[in-house]
Amino acid sequence: MIIFKNLILKISSLRFAISLIIFIAIASGIGTFIPQDNNNKFYIDNFDRAPIFGLLDGEKVLKLQLDHIYTSFWFLFTLILLCISLAACSFRRQIPSLKASLKWIEYKSEKKFSKLQLTRSHPINQDGEHISKVDLLLKKKGWKTYKFNSHISARKGLIGKIGPLVVHIGLIVLLIGSAYGSFTSQSKEQYLLPGETLNLVNESTNSRANVKLVDFSIERESDGVPKQFISKLNFSSENLNLNEIKTTKVNHPIRFKGLTIYQADWAISNIVLEIDNILYQLQLKEIPEIGNQVWGVLVELGSETKKNYLLTIDNENGPLKISNIENFSGNNLYINEDPLEVNSSKVSLKKIIPSSGLIIKNDPSIPFIYFSFILIIFGTIISLIPTNQLWILVNKESQKLSIGGLSNKNLVGFKKEFFKLSDEIKNF
């Protein structure tokens, strides 16, 4: 029993909770540094050649579950521990503190007033109804009062005492929601060409719809660096009687029937070439060996003796580079310019077709996350409300009225209110 009590004391301590939060923050940071949820070969190939900090190779990354941190045993165990710590702290400290603050404290003697932050006393007439008058005044000022025969207990801002408990509940909901989301959330990356349609099905809400990419554009800085990707999507559904167009950008997702659609990436998927008066639409693939965001395709050109040429492009506005794979010498081809003669073939670029990279995510934990944030914000705000307490004691023998006050926050503001009340009571 003693061991269990000591264990609860340690788990419910602020130091223990802060240690867990720091550990979770470090683990989350590692999770952003190490790519998550790839196959084992990816980690072996990448981290065997260049171990993390010179220590963690691919095998150790897999063994320590750093390839899926947010669903790993040790990370989820840490979340559970933090939930237990917050719950234990709430039951051991916050709830008893709240219960204690609900009880009315009596100050029956003038000696106790000396322990208060603010005290004052006034002479009174023996026959006056001072207690009733003071009680009425305090109620008009918004104070909750409890009147005894010769003294009054009053308080204001008791809701501030609930704040820390609400924050703890919000954090627990956040942790539970995050753990729930790590197991239940699903995401899919999809590249769409303008005019292409994707079927959306959300089994959790039993809703179906079609989403069509109407238009995709890229905003660039003056130096050509991509600034923003914009997709205009048409949502349609006969069952839902729906037909509307919505726009998604980077950091501006679309939420639709429990699904969230993010603008994540882009690619150049196709080009339209005219080769010797015949139109061809060629599909491109990314070529990381050449550079970042470079797409290309290998084609045969030549009216008599055919040769292989590599076509590469890195911008939706062009140019298209045509390179001889024998010596990698090449020429640039621009949209709708005069045809370029390559190995006796006439080649012209008619169209560059970029595709929009979208991530469709279904995360049932989102309502929990939003609700937890509301609780945390609400709890933090009401925690700032000071809890003020007043005690008034009438001593008919010494013909003196004593008033004392206590505040847990904003003593300067309470001091002004205290002396103003004291002066009003003095004028009775």
UniProtKB/Swiss-Prot annotation:
- Pfam family of this protein, just one? ResB
Source organism superkingdom? Bacteria
According to the UniProt record, one GO cellular component term is: plasma membrane-derived thylakoid membrane
* Swiss-Prot/TrEMBL GO biological process terms: cytochrome complex assembly
Membrane topology designation = Multi-pass membrane protein
Compartmental location: Cellular thylakoid membrane
Which keywords does UniProt give here? Answer: Cytochrome c-type biogenesis, Membrane, Thylakoid, Transmembrane, Transmembrane helix
Which residues are listed as membrane-spanning? 14-34, 72-92, 162-182
Q: Which family does it belong to?
A: Belongs to the Ccs1/CcsB family.
Q: What does this protein do?
A: Required during biogenesis of c-type cytochromes (cytochrome c6 and cytochrome f) at the step of heme attachment.
Oligomeric state and interaction partners are given as: May interact with CcsA.
PANTHER family assigned to the protein according to its UniProt record, in alphabetical order = CYTOCHROME C BIOGENESIS PROTEIN CCS1, CHLOROPLASTIC (PTHR31566:SF0)
This chain belongs to the protein called: Cytochrome c biogenesis protein CcsB
- The organism is Prochlorococcus marinus (strain AS9601)
